[in-house]
Structure formats: structure tokens, C-alpha cells
Amino acid sequence: GVAGVDLIPAVSAHEADRWMARATATLASLRPGGYDYAYPTKILASLAQGTPVIYAGPGQAAHDVVEAGLGVACSLDVDEIAEAMVAFASGSAPWVGAEAVRAWVRKHRSVEASSCSAAMVVRSAL
């Protein structure tokens, strides 16, 4: 293994929350070309714990991570991912802070926010 990097087997959601809450950053990835429209829920789980994310992949998630200061977005490339890990370990990665990311999740990606967006689409079709 790599010093300072913990790779753990699959655990319950409760246990995963505990690990994410203590992490310096979490890593979520999505292979390009397959599910570019998908939004990895690992990102939201990490941010809900107030932990920044390294997102390696395409799509809206990459845009959100960069634009909102939720962590680092990069391509699915081992060197870019390693650079992001080093940036978090050294304290130089962009990050708006735990409370700001929790507020961003509530405003943009919560069940309430998604429900309001869906309702607006339905209303606009009437």
C-alpha cells in the first residue's frame, strides 16, 4: 500500500460515513464514455460529511466540484489523481470548507432541491 492511504473493503453505509467524516478527502470516479450523465452519489456522501472530494471523471459532477470549490476534479488518470491527493495532503487544494459544502449540497443536490427542480419542469409543461 501507500503510506497515508487507506483502502478498505466494502462496509455498511454507517461505517462508510464514519470513514468519510475522518478523511482528508475522498475519491470518486466515473469511467468516461459510459455514464457521462451520471452523478456519483459518493460525491454527495462525502460532502454531507463535510469532507472534500477528488472526482476523477466527466460530466456535471466535475463542473460542480470545480465551480463550487468542493474539491478537485481531474480526468481518470493516475498521475492527476495522485497530484490531487498530494494537494489535499499538503493543504494546497481548493476547498470552501465543511459548512459551505453542506450548504451547497442542500441548495443544489438535496432531495428538496431535486424535487423543486422536477416540479418546475412539470409546471412548465402545463
Q: At which residue positions do the language-model features occur?
A:
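Nucleotide-activated donor-binding/catalytic signature segment of Leloir-type glycosyltransferases, i.e.
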Residues: 1-17
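Nucleotide-sugar-dependent
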Residues: 12-19, 26-44, 54-63
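Short alpha-helix at the nucleotide-sugar/activated-sugar donor binding site of glycosyltransferases
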Residues: 47, 66
